[in-house]
Amino acid sequence: MIGRISRFMTRFVSRWLPDPLIFAMLLTLLTFVIALWLTPQTPISMVKMWGDGFWNLLAFGMQMALIIVTGHALASSAPVKSLLRTAASAAKTPVQGVMLVTFFGSVACVINWGFGLVVGAMFAREVARRVPGSDYPLLIACAYIGFLTWGGGFSGSMPLLAATPGNPVEHIAGLIPVGDTLFSGFNIFITVALIVVMPFITRMMMPKPSDVVSIDPKLLMEEADFQKQLPKDAPPSELLEESRILTLIIGALGIAYLAMYFSEHGFNITINTVNLMFMIAGLLLHKTPMAYMRAISAAARSTAGILVQFPFYAGIQLMMEHSGLGGLITEFFINVANKDTFPVMTFFSSALINFAVPSGGGHWVIQGPFVMPAAQALGADLGKSVMAIAYGEQWMNMAQPFWALPALAIAGLGVRDIMGYCITALLFSGVIFVIGLTLF
C-alpha cells in the first residue's frame, strides 16, 4: 500500500508541483488575498507589511547559505569522504541504503538540524555512489525525511525559546524548562518512534527495479582534488596561499573560541556555532587556505535558491504576523478544542501555518501568544502545547519544499524529484505525532 501511495504521490507532484520559487510567489499572493478577506487590513497596509518584512531574514539567509557551502566543503575533504564511504559501506543493497540513510538523517537532525540537513544529503549521495541500483531521488528524500525529528532534538527552536528569558511569551506562561519539552516522556516517545519506524516506511517506498530513476552520472562523480602542487620557484604570495601554517593558526583560534563557548554555555549549539565548527573543520581538513577556498567556490553554486527565496518568506511571515491572520488560524483550532484535544488541534494549526511560515522561531512569535493563554485556560499541559507547535511545523515540512533546498542543492536535484516520497512520509508520520500527543 505504501508503495502504491508513494508512486501516486510522485506522479502527482511531478505534474503539479512548481519550482520552489514559484511556490513562494504563489504563497505570497495567497496570503495577501486571504488576509484581505479575513482580517480588517487594506491592500495598502498589506503591501506595506510585505515590503517591510521582505528583508527581515537577511541574516538568517546568510546563515543558511553558509551552512550549505561550509558543510559541502567539509564533506568534500579527503578525511570526511573516507568516513562517509566507510559508513555507507554498511549498505549492501538498495533497500538497506534507503533504511540506513533515513536512520542516519533522523539521528543527525536530533543532534542539530543544520548539521543533519547537510550531512544527511552528503551521506545519501555517498550511498548512491556505492550501492548499484539505488534510486537516487528516494535516497535524497530519505535524508530530508530525517528532518522530521529536528523540532524535538537538541536544536529545536521552540522548546529552546520557551526556556529562554525574554522570549515573546514569557510574560504569559513564564519560562518552560526543557525537562517539560525536549526531555519529556512524550517527546522521547515521538522522537524514538520516528527514528525507528520511518526507515521501515521508506523501505516500502522502494520503486520496482524497472521504475528506478536513472541519474546523470556526473551528479555522482567524486569532486576534484582541491590541493595544488606548487613549483619550487613559486612566488611568496602563492606560498602564503598554500601555507598549512596559516591554516593551523586560524584553526587553533577557532578551536579555542569553541572551547570557551561550550564551557560557558554547555551543549547549546546554534546555527552560528555549527557554521563555525564546519568552517574550522573544513579549513583544517583541506590543509591550506586556497584549497579550502576552491572547495567553497565549488559549493557556492548550490545557494542560489535559498538566496532568492528567503526574502519572499520573510515578507509572508510579516504579513501573517502583523495582519493577524496567523492568530486567526490558531484561534479557529483552539476554539474547537478541549483540554484533551488541545495539543492535537494546536499541532494541526501549526502545520497549516507552516505553509506560509516555514520557520520554528516564526511560529513561536505568531502562535505562542494565542496558544499559551488558551492552554492555561483549558488546563492543558504547557510543555506539550509548546511541542505541539514544534511538531506541526516539522511535520508539514514534508510538504513544504523550503527546507528541502539545502539537500536538493547538494544533490543536484529538483523539488519534484523527492516531494512525492516526502508527502507519503507526511501521511504516515502524522500518526506517530497524534499518538504521542494523545496518549502521554
Model-based region annotation:
Residues 14-15, 51-54, 87-100, 129-134, ...:
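Transmembrane-helix boundary/entry motifs in multi-pass membrane transporters
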Residues 40-52, 166-178, 262-268, 322-335:
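Membrane-interface helix termini and inter-helical loops of multi-pass transporters
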Residues 94-108, 133-154, 161, 173-179, ...:
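Alpha-helical transmembrane segments of multi-pass membrane proteins
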Residues 4-9, 45-50, 75-91, 125-135, ...:
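Flexible loop linkers connecting adjacent transmembrane helices
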Residues 90-123, 307-320, 334-373, 377-378:
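Hydrophobic alpha-helical transmembrane segments of multi-pass integral membrane proteins
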Residues 123-213, 403-436:
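Membrane-core helix-loop-helix motifs of multi-pass transport proteins
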